[in-house]
Amino acid sequence: MLAFYYYYAQYWKRKAAYALLQYGRNAQNHEERKWAAQQALMAGHKDAAKLYALTCPEAFDKELPLVPFYRDNIKCVFADYYYSKRFHNFIDEDQWQFANTVYLFKEGKDECSQYFAQTFKALRPACDITIMFMPCSTQKHYYNRFSSLAYFFLKFRGVQSGIDYISFTGERESKHTSQQRNKIEESSNYIINTNLTGKKIIIVDDLLTTGKSLSSYAKKLKDSGAEIAGAIFLAKTFLLPTNAKVKWIVWKHFFLS
């Protein structure tokens, strides 16, 4: 009889956990999503940790939107988090819209000037700045992606553009679509065609993930005489924490509240 009641209780616990997870995934209010994810996790649903982490990314990342931080001694700022497509069933409407904006920017369909203006302001750069853009897989992609943004900074911010300071020597595989992105040599298809001695450079790119591209490009700019004043990004890829870390945060919050 005790075994029957135990399995009966476990059955309804699983049903409750599933219902809470679905409620959280569909909730529009942030606090409701957070509460439902927390309750589903404590009820034992295997996907609840993912929902909670994606609902509260700032709880699991030391590098926050529009707050300067450093990578390889380079002062960096990004506008918001980007979430991989495999997480799109667990993010809210605003997060999905921003992720879609990143895709549009990559395709040259949205200059995202309002987001880059926010990152530029948060970086608090000195005067006499030149912006240079992260080289792409092809010259066509490079100019489609960055030419409108370069014009925006020149017209509305008075910032000199270095968009033509690099020349493309060929094409390389796109890191965005490659299955072996870590093996791609970013500097294999371009050269810096201008002496940058004395220029203070802010690097502009769409997405910060590992920081490998940033470090590689910054080195080439320094080798050409530039001083790196900072880097701004449209987004930073949110890396999902382990389930154990999420559970620790949730249960700690529960017992301390």
Question: What are the functions of these language-model segments?
Answer:
Residues 136-144:
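Glycine-rich phosphate-binding loops at beta-strand->alpha-helix junctions
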Residues 128-137:
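Short glycine-rich phosphate-binding loop at a beta-alpha junction
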Residues 34-47, 53:
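TPR/TPR-like (Sel1-like) alpha-helical repeat modules
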Residues 50-128, 167-195, 237:
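Active-site-facing substrate-recognition patch
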Residues 2-5, 23, 40-43:
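Alpha-helical solenoid scaffolds that mediate protein-protein interactions
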